[in-house]
Structures are given as structure tokens and as C-alpha cells.
A protein has these predicted regions:
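N-terminal secretory signal peptides
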Residues: 36-84
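Positively charged n-region of N-terminal signal peptides that target proteins for export
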Residues: 1-11
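An acidic-aromatic
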Residues: 68-110
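Short, surface-exposed beta-strand-loop junctions and turns on beta-sheet-rich folds
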Residues: 62, 86-88, 116-117
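Short N-terminal edge-element motif at the start of the domain
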Residues: 24-38
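Hydrophobic membrane-insertion alpha-helices, especially the h-region
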Residues: 11-26
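A short, sequence-level motif marking secondary-structure junctions
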Residues: 47-50, 74, 86, 125-127, ...
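Mature, soluble, non-transmembrane domains
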Residues: 94, 98-171
Length: 171
């Protein structure tokens, strides 16, 4: 009985230290997670600073050519600034209202798209070579995770992420 009381005090103290640490360091972060077999795995975490660059590279599933999407984090959400691609096709921007279109270095480029996206949800696919570059670091997700793996990229506080991990759901 005495041992259980000591153990509970230790658990309480450790929990209190963790929660205090999270409150003190509760800076907004960008999380990249991969869901495998119902378990969320953290792939990367970076400080959610304004103008943080994010690049998504993949092979278009229909055209079988490279696509590069360039985004930046504005402090609250992601802004799709530019899309570069090698061939026109389904799902690729082409209308005047999509932005400013031009050709450069063998790529079709749609600049000044300025589309806001709060959270990104991607999937690894057969032959798509899904890769992201976040704050200068490259993650070849297609090499790390099986085909069909859900990849989420979103801003959240460390404290909120801690409680999601404990409770098991977003609130």
C-alpha cells in the first residue's frame, strides 16, 4: 500500500513537470504526421514561424511528370504561392484566375496563386515519390511509409498536441 502511494506521488510529480514544461514552451509548431495502422507517428516538428517555407514534390498520378507546390506559413495557415509542373493535365492549374502563368526552365509555372490552406492532408501513392521540404529539411515520405499512408501537415501548440496524445482525439 505504501509503495502505491509513493508511485502515485512520483507519477503526479512527473506529470506536473511535463505539463509545466509544455506551458512554458507552448510555442506554436508545425507538425508533420503519418498515420500507420491507426497510430499517428510524428515525422517532423518545426517552429511555426512566419514565412516558413514548405515545398511538396510528387509525380502526377495521371501525367507521370513532376509537380512542385511551393507554400509558406503565414503564422496561422499555409498559403499556396506557386505550382511548377512539366505538362498540362487533370488537376493542374491553368486558368487566368489561378494566378500568373508563364514558362521557365522547362516548367509551366503558376505564380501568385495565394490560396489559403489551414491543414494539408496528403497520401503516399504508387510511383508518386511524395517528398516534402520543410524549413530546408527534405523528407522522402514515399521511402519511409507504405503506399496509401495518410500524411498530415498542420499547426498546433505543443500543449494541445500533448493532450491530443493523452486523450486520443482533437478538441
Amino acid at each position: 500500500m505504501r509503495y502505491e502511494g509513493i508511485l502515485m506521488k512520483k507519477i503526479f510529480i512527473v506529470t506536473l513537470i511535463i505539463v509545466t514544461f509544455l506551458f512554458v514552451t507552448n510555442q506554436e509548431k508545425i507538425f508533420v504526421t503519418a498515420e500507420v495502422d491507426g497510430v499517428e507517428n510524428i515525422v517532423a516538428t518545426v517552429d511555426a514561424k512566419k514565412n516558413l517555407p514548405l515545398e511538396i514534390n510528387f509525380i502526377h498520378s495521371v501525367q507521370k511528370t513532376p509537380v512542385i507546390e511551393e507554400l509558406e506559413f503565414d503564422g496561422e495557415k499555409f498559403i499556396l504561392r506557386r505550382t511548377k509542373y512539366k505538362s498540362h493535365g487533370v488537376g493542374l492549374p491553368f486558368m487566368e484566375s489561378d494566378g500568373n502563368f508563364h514558362e521557365e526552365g522547362g516548367y509551366f509555372i503558376m505564380d501568385d496563386m495565394n490560396r489559403t490552406i489551414e491543414n494539408l492532408s496528403l497520401r503516399t501513392g504508387v510511383g508518386t515519390n511524395l517528398t516534402i521540404k520543410l524549413d530546408g529539411e527534405e523528407f522522402k515520405l514515399y521511402e519511409e511509409f507504405p503506399t496509401g499512408t495518410k500524411i498530415d501537415i498542420y499547426p498546433s501548440s505543443s500543449l494541445k498536441k500533448f493532450f491530443i496524445a493523452i486523450i486520443g482525439r482533437n478538441f
